[in-house]
């Protein structure tokens, strides 16, 4: 959520941000917000003046009654009228405050100056050079779905029977490989990258979704348990960030770094017509998430650190990838700056998103009321929050299966995963 003071002082800058994000349709909301803010401040001033008058007259009434020097009836009648006027103003202020909060929750985050201006994903910039690893595939490459079925390690048909399309089942060594991938990433982040592991709930309340920005803008993308008013998490970012909702953090404790595994659930409403084969688009997948809480002046260095930690996982797995700096028209509404990390699919002949690393600045912290005090004399400040996928296993599994396939129709296991799997290859006879 943006600071209303920032919006009031920089309305043209906010309007430019909406234009750069291709959200010109939100400009009437901005104009309405500015109108409400002006009216609200006028009403607050008038209410304060009337309350001050009521306090003064109340003292005069008390003095008249005490001294008996005159009648207080007219003053009492006047103050009753003032009280009714104050009640009306308070009611109007309450309505304005609710509408203001509704608009503030709907407006996107500011953009860091380093974010390139663009309309669509086609305008994203390749950051640095793509990273390659030697995986000679001198034969006709099979896709992950074909190989997974042939080896008996993936079962999308039974997943569809049990739940519906987009809910995969990992079988045998496929399940073992998935678990190995999760454990390897958690170990690398906690033992080498300095994160504290947490294992969060997979269901959250609406306040948690509001805190991280999924509510109300992306309400149609989450699974909702209406009877209990709980929601299946789209990412561990939601419960982990909200661990510190409504808290005053110790400045000495910052930065705080968490790594969390969770299953992730996404309705993917509006994805009809997109490629939905295999792991390319699923409703449930596994992911290890990195979340950081930092001082404002340290957040952009922390973003580069998170990106580096995600890249380190791919380098250890020897999976080819590239990094994109997202443009203004493709970046999420909550992020001020975002990198996407994409892995190469030999069968699809294209890059697939496996990680997003974002700096939200104080956008989430304002919504979730997460603050810190630099010292005992300072005013509380909002922390900056960041997160990064470290990483999503579904797209990693695509790349591993396709890059490590053998001429015989099997799959070699990446060397760093062998201690976790207990086997180095998945053969057609498994």
UniProtKB/Swiss-Prot annotation:
InterPro entries: aa-tRNA-synt_IIb, aa-tRNA-synth_II, aa-tRNA-synth_II/BPL/LPL, Ser-tRNA-ligase_type_1, Ser-tRNA-synth_1_N, SerRS_1_N_sf, SerRS_core, tRNA-bd_arm. GO terms for biological process: selenocysteine biosynthetic process; seryl-tRNA aminoacylation. CDD domains: SerRS_core. It holds the Pfam family tRNA-synt_2b. Its EC number is 6.1.1.11. GO terms for molecular function: ATP binding; serine-tRNA ligase activity. PROSITE patterns: AA_TRNA_LIGASE_II. ATP binds at residues 266-268, 282, 353-356. The keyword Ligase applies. One of its GO terms (cellular component) is cytoplasm. Keywords: Aminoacyl-tRNA synthetase, ATP-binding, Cytoplasm, Ligase, Nucleotide-binding, Protein biosynthesis. It comes from the Bacteria. It catalyses: tRNA(Ser) + L-serine + ATP = L-seryl-tRNA(Ser) + AMP + diphosphate + H(+); tRNA(Sec) + L-serine + ATP = L-seryl-tRNA(Sec) + AMP + diphosphate + H(+). Belongs to the class-II aminoacyl-tRNA synthetase family. Type-1 seryl-tRNA synthetase subfamily. Consists of two distinct domains, a catalytic core and a N-terminal extension that is involved in tRNA binding. Catalyzes the attachment of serine to tRNA(Ser). Is also able to aminoacylate tRNA(Sec) with serine, to form the misacylated tRNA L-seryl-tRNA(Sec), which will be further converted into selenocysteinyl-tRNA(Sec). Homodimer. The tRNA molecule binds across the dimer. This is Serine--tRNA ligase. It comes from Chlorobium luteolum (strain DSM 273 / BCRC 81028 / 2530) (Pelodictyon luteolum). The lineage of its organism: Bacteria, Pseudomonadati, Chlorobiota, Chlorobiia, Chlorobiales. The gene is serS.
């Amino acid at each position: 959520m943006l600071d209303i003071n920032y919006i009031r002082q920089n309305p043209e800058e906010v309007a430019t941000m909406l234009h750069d994000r291709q959200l010109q349709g939100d400009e009437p909301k901005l104009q309405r917000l500015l109108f409400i803010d002006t009216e609200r401040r006028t009403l607050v001033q008038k209410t304060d003046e009337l309350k001050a008058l009521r306090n003064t007259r109340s003292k005069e009434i008390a003095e008249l009654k005490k001294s008996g020097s005159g009648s207080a009836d007219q003053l009492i009648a006047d103050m009753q009228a003032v009280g009714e006027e104050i009640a009306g103003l308070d009611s109007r202020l309450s309505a304005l405050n609710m509408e203001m909060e509704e608009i503030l929750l709907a407006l996107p985050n500011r953009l860091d100056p380093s974010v390139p201006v663009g309309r669509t994903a086609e305008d994203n910039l390749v950051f640095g050079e793509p990273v390659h690893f030697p995986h000679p595939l001198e034969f006709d490459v099979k896709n992950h779905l074909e190989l997974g079925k042939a080896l008996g390690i993936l079962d999308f048909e039974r997943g569809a029977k049990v739940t519906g399309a987009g809910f995969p089942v990992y079988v045998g060594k496929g399940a073992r490989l998935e678990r190995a991938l999760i454990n390897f990433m958690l170990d690398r982040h906690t033992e080498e990258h300095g994160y504290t592991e947490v294992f969060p709930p997979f269901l959250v309340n609406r306040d948690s979704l509001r805190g991280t920005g999924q509510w109300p803008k992306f309400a149609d993308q989450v699974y909702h348990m209406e009877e209990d008013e709980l929601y299946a998490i789209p990412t561990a970012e939601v419960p982990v960030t909200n661990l510190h909702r409504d808290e005053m953090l110790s400045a000495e404790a910052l930065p705080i770094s968490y790594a969390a595994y969770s299953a992730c659930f996404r309705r993917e409403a509006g994805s009809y017509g997109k490629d939905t084969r295999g792991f390319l688009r699923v409703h449930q997948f596994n992911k290890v998430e990195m979340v950081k809480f930092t001082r404002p002046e340290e957040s952009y260095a922390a973003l580069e650190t998170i990106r580096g930690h995600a890249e380190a996982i791919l380098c250890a797995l020897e999976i080819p990838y590239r990094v994109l700096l997202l443009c203004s028209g493709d970046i999420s509404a909550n992020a001020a700056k975002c990198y996407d990390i994409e892995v190469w699919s030999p069968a699809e002949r294209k890059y697939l998103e496996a990680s997003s690393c974002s700096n939200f600045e104080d956008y989430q912290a304002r919504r979730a009321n997460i603050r810190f005090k630099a010292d005992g004399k300072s005013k509380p400040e909002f922390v900056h929050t960041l997160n990064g996928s470290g990483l999503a296993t579904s797209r990693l599994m695509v790349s591993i299966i396709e890059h490590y396939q053998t001429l015989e129709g099997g799959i070699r296991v990446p060397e760093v995963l062998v201690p976790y799997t207990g086997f180095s290859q998945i053969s057609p006879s498994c």
